[in-house]
């Protein structure tokens, strides 16, 4: 494992990667703590945000420690079982986070298009949606394990990546079933999530532009700004990595594939808490209130 062609730069690459991982862990843990301890934030929008922060923390932690071990200590060995486990958890968390982003889009859709029905999104309903996202992700990703273990491996044991991806490429047999299942999952789960998110925001825009007041329009759309930024950050590098690996061929240098894949598990988890902290007034106000006693004491 590692980043082929950039071995001499591993130490330098580890510096920004370490910074991003520390910020991602600290930011998401703080966001979860803030939402769980502030009763005024116990609303559907923020409960979904706490789920997103949990998924971001887990996604970064599933990959980053091994990436940093490779970059720092040249610890490039990993057992097959550990590699499969890492692959499973990265895919599992990705699919679950995609479902959470869809749930957040639905939350904004109901809040803006049907505000009088927004009370249907109780804390109990939010918990059920969260459980459904986890269960869906589990059943989608479990077959990956069986598909990997069913293959025959003939001694090739080098994964040209900073974490465990594309394990099936090490097999010496036919991997068409694995490829077809991977494409099917990408299209029918994550792809469907994206389509439903687009539909939700199309309906939101339709409702917003029926409002005569520009101030009211801006206020309605401002509640969606953070979510839209997070959606673009989550899906864009993921699909670039997914499509470049399958169709990029030799047009994109291999180390670019690996760097984008590595940044994908660090940059969104790092930036999501910052985006919501800056763009969401309620969270910004609570952060200021939380630290104001410290400022007074100093």
From Swiss-Prot:
It is a multi-pass membrane protein. It comes from the Eukaryota. Residues 1-14, 65-85, 150-178, 245-257 are extracellular. Residues 36-43, 107-128, 200-223, 279-298 are cytoplasmic. It is found in: Cell membrane. Gene3D superfamilies: Rhodopsin 7-helix transmembrane proteins (1.20.1070.10). The keyword Disulfide bond applies. SMART domains: 7TM_GPCR_Srsx. One of its GO terms (cellular component) is plasma membrane. GO terms for molecular function: G protein-coupled receptor activity; olfactory receptor activity. Keywords: Cell membrane, Disulfide bond, G-protein coupled receptor, Membrane, Olfaction, Receptor, Sensory transduction, Transducer, Transmembrane, Transmembrane helix. The chain crosses the membrane at residues 15-35, 44-64, 86-106, 129-149, 179-199, 224-244, 258-278. Disulfide bonds join 83-164. Belongs to the G-protein coupled receptor 1 family. Odorant receptor. This is Olfactory receptor 52Z1P. It comes from Homo sapiens (Human). The lineage of its organism: Eukaryota, Metazoa, Chordata, Craniata, Vertebrata.
């Amino acid at each position: 494992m590692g980043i082929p062609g950039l071995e001499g730069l591993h130490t330098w690459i580890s510096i920004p990667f370490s910074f991003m991982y520390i910020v991602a862990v600290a930011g998401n843990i703080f966001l979860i703590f803030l939402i769980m301890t502030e009763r005024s934030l116990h609303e559907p929008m923020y409960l979904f945000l706490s789920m997103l922060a949990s998924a971001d923390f887990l996604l970064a932690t599933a990959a980053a420690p091994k990436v940093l071990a490779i970059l720092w200590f040249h610890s490039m060995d990993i057992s097959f079982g550990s590699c499969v486990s890492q692959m499973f958890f990265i895919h599992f968390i990705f699919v679950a986070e995609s479902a959470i982003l869809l749930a957040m889009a639905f939350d904004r859709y109901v809040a803006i298009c049907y505000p009088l029905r927004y009370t249907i999104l109780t804390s109990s309903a939010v918990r059920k949606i969260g459980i459904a996202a986890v269960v869906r992700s589990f059943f989608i990703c479990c077959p990956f394990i069986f598909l990997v273990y069913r293959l025959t491996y003939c001694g090739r044991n080098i994964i040209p990546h900073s974490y465990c991806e594309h394990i099936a490429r090490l097999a010496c047999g036919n991997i068409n079933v694995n490829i077809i299942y991977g494409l099917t999952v990408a299209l029918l789960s994550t792809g469907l999530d994206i389509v439903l998110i687009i539909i939700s925001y199309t309906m939101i825009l339709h409702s917003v532009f029926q409002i005569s007041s520009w101030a009211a329009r801006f206020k309605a759309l401002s509640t969606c700004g953070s979510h839209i930024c997070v959606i673009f950050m989550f899906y864009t590098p993921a699909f670039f990595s997914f499509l470049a690996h399958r169709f990029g061929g030799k047009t994109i240098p291999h180390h670019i594939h690996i760097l984008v894949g590595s940044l994908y598990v660090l940059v969104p988890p790092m930036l999501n808490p910052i985006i919501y902290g800056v763009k969401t007034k309620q969270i910004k106000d609570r952060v200021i209130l939380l630290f104001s006693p410290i400022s007074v004491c100093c």
